[in-house]
Amino acid sequence: MVSLLKKLIGSRNDRLLKQYRKLVTQINNLEPQIAALSDEALQAKTQEFRDRHAKGTSLDDLLPEAFAVVREAGKRVFGMRHFDAQLLGGIALHNGKIAEMRTGEGKTLMATLPVYLNAIAAKGVHVVTVNDYLARRDADWMGRLYRFLGMSTGVVVPQQPNEEKIAAYRADITYGTNNEFGFDYLRDNMEYRVEDRRQRGLAYAIVDEVDSILIDEARTPLIISGQAEDHTELYVRMNAVPPLLKRMAGEPKPHEPEPEGDYWVDEKSQQVHLSESGHESAEKILTRLGILPEGESLYDPRHIALMHHMMVALRAHTLFFLDQQYVIQDGEVVIVDEFTGRLMAGRRWSDGLHQAVEAKEGVKIQHENQTLASITFQNYFRMYEKLSGMTGTADTEAYEFQEIYSLETVIIPTNKPMQRKDQNDQVFRTSQEKYNAILNDIRDCHERGQPVLVGTTSIENSELLSGLLKKAKLPHEVLNAKQHAREAEIVAEAGKPGHITIATNMAGRGTDIVLGGSVEKQIDLIRADENLSEAEKTARIERVRQEWKPLNEQVKAAGGLRIIGTERHESRRIDNQLRGRAGRQGDPGSSRFYLSLEDPLMRIFAGDRVRAIMERLKLPEGEPIEAGMVTRSIETAQRKVEGRNFDIRKQLLEYDDVANDQRKVLYAQRNDVLEAKTIGASVENLRDAAVTELFRGFVPAESVEEQWDIAGLQQALASDWQLQLPLAEMVEAEPKLTDEELLERVLQAARDTYRSKSELVGEESWGQFERSIMLQSIDTHWREHLSALDYLRQGIHLRGYAQKNPKQEYKREAFELFSGMLDRIRDDVVRVLMTVRVQSTEQVAQAEAEAAQSHVQNVQFHHSDYDEALASEAAEAQEPVRNVLPKVGRNDACPCGSGKKYKQCHGKLT
């Protein structure tokens, strides 16, 4: 019935494309008129559009003309004309949707259409890329078109001086990575001066490779952290425990005897669980090693941290392996991203896991970190007024984009029909049989002059395959995290005749593989040669292109690019991304995945079913199954994994939404403090509320004198706020004194004491001091609150055993924690301001600078691929920033990481 309706009225995608094609017709009709304009007249269109928009013309109404102008500018600047398919994609992006376009269809050029149109509003457009190389490349490349049309571009990258970053955000169009945009948002909410903030609002963002950023990286929050308590010795001692515990043969099953052993590993959830006997064994081992005192239990409240450290050590030994999840580089454990295979310099696992892995590998253990600020990509990108994205593979995750981000996916038809042939998977019994078949396929392609791209899921597998190819004397390139610096160069050469390239997952994404090899690098070198005249440059470029044509034809005749997958990823989308490297813009190509029953995905999710099929068919050794049924069975397993991962992300989001609501409230209050001309009235309200609450603790409202604890109140006022008041004498001297009158006298005494301090140092200096103390208190208590929320979340699932809804309990308790935090901020601010002894303006300035410095000590930034570029640019980026504050000179860089001199940043707070 549903398919019949689709035939009659078309799918939602068909109906959207039908609407968009009407706009494409309008744009095409404008082409001759726009083409007739001179360069000056074309450039003047930008100001004309801005004037019309300021007078009320909507961006939707400007779209046909603006897109026609960009298309014409593209022809004049690049010699490239936007295809109709790119216009369709541009319209989808402007309408806040995800445009799915095949690899090689020109997503980068397509983005110029909605970017230009939305930049007319002068609110700033953010173009989000997956790495710094692509951000710089696209800003430089597309910037030529924007500058031709009179628009400014900027790019934000790690370790950029603050002045440059602010200028980049003030540009009409800003390029950068998802990490940098997110971190800058967090940094802006940690600043002590309005003028140091970078971003000017979140109006419109286009996210390139949107599936990678909004789905693959959505489980990892962005975290700015500082050093916490040192547990180095405990990690080293706890590292001796896992080898002494015995792993069980399998997971215990209900109503069956528990297998012998101390623990089992759940590979699906990436967790380790102790058995009943395992708990006893662990206590004995910890006691024997002197970690747990004799006769005491691991479950005593004071030993709960030991349990956590032991489980982390177990996970490090059983679930995290060298050259799979991490590598050792320069004596440090560096994480390998599971989706891209890239090294994540600067990123560290949390909850002590990174330290446990360091202890396992015998490298220097670095300090644990305390979270200073944190946000997930889901919550960061949902703050944009309008969000859109582009990718080659979004359709498999369309439901999640709609559910989480309210983003609809529009599949854009290819400019030319796709010719790639996707062959059925071949499944072997063992890895050895699988690799033999892969070698035979690669050898055949190499001999026929067909380029091959082999996709692996880990560095270990890529190096294993590389070793096999070396033995077979087959020349090849390896593209994994260890060769990241040469990534673009290796990818550019991957299309040459007979070339063999091994790539870890989707390393090299964003650079096209051109059949016959890329000539762009040679052309760029010719263009940059100042010794050549324009005529000589043109002649040489033409010669290079002519030499490339026979190579291109040779590769096409051999069948185009051959894609070989050595394993299925747990996400169909990652497999599709690998396949999508072949068959660009109507080129020929083919793909095949080789699998074995020993592959992790097959072993965990689909192995039993496929093994049963192989046994029934009685296939000889080395003979694979190759059938659509098997491929479908594997895809069913992948759907299960995708569904589970979606549930995990959705559940994480539901919990993070609680923290996000609190973050919005706190950051809004912090910004009010930062932006207000004076916060004296706010401080007065806080002080009066704090005094009243303290007073009512000793003198209840509407109570009689016999219920009053005047001695206790007098002592509390003196110790908490240094208010020396003869309250007992007042009450004795005035028998008719009411509690309200007494409260008013206490409030007035507090006001008088406070005013005297303000008058002593001057209103302006005191106002700055108030602001600094308020900001410091907010930041300190927010850090503690984030840690409290983490602990709450880790144990909240246990409420399910008490027949309570863990999510509801988390919301309720998180709200109580937040309310308590706001009260502590108030009390802290009032206590400091009431008890501080001031004698001069200089002392206030010194206290204020110290407050700011304590806030910015030992700052680090964490996320999956943050600081990739820094791994090659600056080795110190991998080390925590350890500033010894008294040594910061006035002309040194400020410890806050802003890039400014100390005297121009936190050294200048007064």
UniProtKB/Swiss-Prot annotation:
The free-text cofactor remark is:
May bind 1 zinc ion per subunit.
Q: Which GO terms describe its cellular component?
A: cell envelope Sec protein transport complex; cytosol; plasma membrane
Q: Where in the cell is it found?
A: Cell inner membrane; Cytoplasm
Annotated membrane topology: Peripheral membrane protein
One matching Pfam family, short form?
P-loop_SecA
Where does the chain bind Zn(2+)? C894, C896, C905, H906
Single GO BP term = intracellular protein transmembrane transport
Main localization of the protein described in the UniProt heading = membrane
Q: Which GO terms describe its molecular function?
A: ATP binding; metal ion binding; protein-exporting ATPase activity
Q: Where does ATP bind?
A: Q86, G104, E105, G106, K107, T108, D512
- Per the entry, which co-factors are needed? Zn(2+)
**Protein's UniProt keywords contain Aminoacyl-tRNA synthetase:** no
Keywords from UniProt, A to Z, are: ATP-binding, Cell inner membrane, Cell membrane, Cytoplasm, Membrane, Metal-binding, Nucleotide-binding, Protein transport, Translocase, Translocation, Transport, Zinc
Gene3D superfamilies (alphabetical): Helical scaffold and wing domains of SecA, P-loop containing nucleotide triphosphate hydrolases, SecA, preprotein cross-linking domain
Superkingdom of origin organism: Bacteria
Q: What InterPro entries does its record include?
A: Helicase_ATP-bd, Helicase_C-like, P-loop_NTPase, SEC_C_motif, SecA, SecA_CS, SecA_DEAD, SecA_motor_DEAD
Catalyses: ATP + H2O + cellular proteinSide 1 = ADP + phosphate + cellular proteinSide 2
Q: What is its EC number?
A: 7.4.2.8
Q: Which family does it belong to?
A: Belongs to the SecA family.
Quaternary arrangement and interactors, per the entry?
Monomer and homodimer. Part of the essential Sec protein translocation apparatus which comprises SecA, SecYEG and auxiliary proteins SecDF-YajC and YidC.
Function of the molecule = Part of the Sec protein translocase complex. Interacts with the SecYEG preprotein conducting channel. Has a central role in coupling the hydrolysis of ATP to the transfer of proteins into and across the cell membrane, serving both as a receptor for the preprotein-SecB complex and as an ATP-driven molecular motor driving the stepwise translocation of polypeptide chains across the membrane.
Name of protein: Protein translocase subunit SecA 1
Gene that produces this protein: secA1
